[in-house]
From Swiss-Prot:
It comes from the Bacteria. This is Diaminobutyrate--2-oxoglutarate transaminase. InterPro entries: Aminotrans_3 (IPR005814), Aminotrans_3_PPA_site (IPR049704), Dat (IPR004637), Ectoine_EctB (IPR012773), PyrdxlP-dep_Trfase (IPR015424), PyrdxlP-dep_Trfase_major (IPR015421), PyrdxlP-dep_Trfase_small (IPR015422). The modification N6-(pyridoxal phosphate)lysine is found at K269. One of its GO terms (biological process) is ectoine biosynthetic process. SUPFAM superfamilies: PLP-dependent transferases. Keywords: Aminotransferase, Pyridoxal phosphate, Transferase. The keyword Oxidoreductase does not apply.
Length: 427
């Protein structure tokens, strides 16, 4: 079989392409935690489609359910019509996810991607409250369309909008200044003081762990205080769980450990189970003031994704999957702490939570060098943070012990090689 010429992508695809530059090979096959390129080289996937493949590649049960559905001429496109797959998904999501957690949410299908759920959340918050402004947080990432981009912190991404991004006030995230300073004192002062110039917003939007902004994990007490502030001022709390949700931090929703109940929750990426496009927006029933068709979209009813998403929920029918994630999370955390201790040259700090972790290095350019070295050794992972200062571990939640150990070993080999060859960019 002839191999695809990389020149095809260089000549015909837009310069905006990104990941194919970081991982310069042509992939052709994937299974579980493994990927293969056209040359037959095997890679361990510690990237998981930026969080869209929490269950790994080509899960057997999801694949069978999808193939059977297609072979039976199951409906593919249906806008937001009532279909068998949608009904099954809604019922199972209620029974397996919402009811056991005592969560009473309506489910909205806003479109196929993460930015769609964020846009609908912002729109609904403004409609419900009659207010225009939103409070977002430093280093947050919420999407690439105008509304979600307006609450995103990254200056490079924001410049791409081409217009002023307005009606948003950015406040400091937990530990943005220092561990000793509670940034919510600052936020609350702005709300209390009529001379601050900050209007009471419609909503606050945040990630409990910032996936693109540096794997920054908010402390439990910080999240709990955010909820109290929102309740005090009648502000809706939106948790963007697009990347941190569906088990990535150790529980299905990333906010469960904090014991908070957001008014609105954004889910996408792995909610579809198989890597198929699907997004949902959850909100308290009393917020459901939409008129029929007031917010719509052609591809908001992906029946193929409903089929695989429903099958994926089987992982959560008891607590065994969650316990396995948390046990492996401890293994990963211990490994990262060991790396920082044994290789002081990298000036590292362990970041994140669960299967959403990494090491931030104070050595300029080091995180990028680690990902490049790891890729050459057969491991796929990316960087995070405003200066790409974090190398980020996002293994599939379904990875077995052998795969996890192999991947972690490659990371250590990569760091060791860089340290020994003095491949550190010294400041």
């Amino acid at each position: 079989m002839s191999q695809t010429d990389m020149n095809v992508f260089e000549q015909l695809e837009s310069e905006v392409r990104s990941y194919c530059r970081s991982f310069p090979t042509v992939f052709t096959k994937a299974k579980g935690y493994k990927m293969w390129d056209e040359a037959g080289k095997e890679y361990i996937d510690f990237f998981s489609g930026a969080g869209a493949l929490n269950y790994g590649h080509n899960d057997e049960k999801m694949k069978k359910a999808l193939v059977d559905y297609i072979m039976d001429d199951g409906i593919t496109h249906s806008l937001d019509m009532a279909t068998t797959p949608k009904g099954k998904f809604l019922q199972k999501f209620h029974d397996v996810i919402l009811k056991p957690r005592n969560l009473d949410y309506k489910v909205m299908f806003p479109g196929p991607t993460g930015t769609n759920t964020v846009e609908s959340a912002l729109k609904l918050a403004r409609k419900v409250t009659g207010r225009t402004d939103i409070i977002s947080f430093t280093n947050g990432f919420h999407g690439m369309t105008i509304g979600s981009l307006s609450v995103t912190g990254n200056s490079f991404k924001r410049k791409g909008a081409g217009i002023p991004l307005t009606n948003v006030v950015t406040m400091p995230y937990d530990n943005f200044v220092s561990e000793s300073l509670d940034t919510l004192d600052y936020l609350e002062r702005f709300l209390e003081d009529g001379g601050s110039g900050v209007e009471i917003p419609a909503a606050m939007i945040l990630e409990t762990v910032q996936g693109e902004g540096g794997i920054n994990a908010a402390r439990t007490e910080w999240l709990q205080r955010v909820e109290k502030i929102c309740k005090r001022w009648g502000i809706l709390l939106i948790i963007d769980d697009v990347q941190a949700g569906v088990g990535r931090t150790g529980t299905f929703f990333s906010f469960e450990d904090a014991g908070i109940t957001p008014d609105i929750v954004c889910l996408s990426k792995s909610i579809g189970g198989f890597g198929l496009p699907l997004a949902i927006t959850l909100f308290r029933p009393e917020l459901d003031i939409w008129a029929p068709g007031e917010h719509n979209g052609t591809f908001r009813g992906n029946n193929h994704a409903f089929v695989t998403a429903t099958e994926a929920l089987s992982y959560w029918e008891d607590d065994s999957f969650e316990k396995d994630i948390q046990e492996k999370s401890a293994t990963i955390s211990d490994f990262l702490v060991k790396l920082v201790t044994e290789y002081p040259e990298i000036k590292g700090e362990v970041k994140g939570k669960g299967f959403m972790v990494g090491i931030a290095s104070d050595v300029e350019g080091f995180a990028s060098k680690v990902t490049e070295e790891a890729f050459s050794r057969g491991l796929i992972m990316e960087t995070s943070g405003p200066n790409d200062e974090v190398f980020k571990l996002f293994p599939p939640l379904t990875i077995d012990d052998e795969g996890l150990e192999k991947g972690l070993a490659i990371i250590e080999e990569s760091i060791k090689a860089l340290v020994e060859t003095k491949e550190l960019v010294m400041q």
